[in-house]
Curated annotation (Swiss-Prot):
Upper taxonomic lineage: Archaea, Methanobacteriati, Methanobacteriota, Methanomada group, Methanococci
Protein's name according to its UniProt entry: Uncharacterized protein MJ1074
Membrane topology per record: Single-pass membrane protein
Main location: membrane
Membrane spanning residue stretches: 85-105
Organism of provenance: Methanocaldococcus jannaschii (strain ATCC 43067 / DSM 2661 / JAL-1 / JCM 10045 / NBRC 100440)
Top-rank taxon, per record: Archaea
Subcellular localization(s) per the UniProt record: Membrane
């Protein structure tokens, strides 16, 4: 950046022969550049705030993910319990309708 300022100063001195006027013009240009830098920096910062996720946004997403995970786990547990009940119903239906199964159960548990 310092090289660009030096080149700017040389160009001004080539075009304007009066040293004092050249210095005034150089200082005015430098001041405009500094003001422009601040404006551009603030605009960029505002744009990035809108575009990029902040820590607050990330925390909100994490909370939503945790809530979704809990809902999914509850759903899976509910389905698991339903499957268990259906399997038990089928097992009891097989046992009740099959006379040989009843005899086998009596033998397994020691009943005669």
């Amino acid at each position: 950046m310092a090289i660009a300022y030096a080149k700017l100063y040389e160009l001004i001195h080539k075009k304007i022969k009066d040293e004092r006027e050249a210095d005034e013009l150089y200082n005015a240009i430098i001041e405009i550049i500094k003001e422009s830098k601040v404006i551009v920096k603030n605009e960029l910062k505002d744009e990035l705030k809108d575009e990029l996720a902040t820590k607050k946004d990330i925390d909100l997403v994490r909370e939503e993910m945790k809530a979704m995970e809990e809902r999914i786990l509850r759903y899976v547990d509910n389905r698991f319990n339903q499957l268990l009940i259906v399997q038990l119903i089928i097992l009891f239906a097989i046992i009740i309708t099959n006379p040989n199964a009843i005899e086998l159960i009596k033998l397994l548990f020691g009943f005669k």
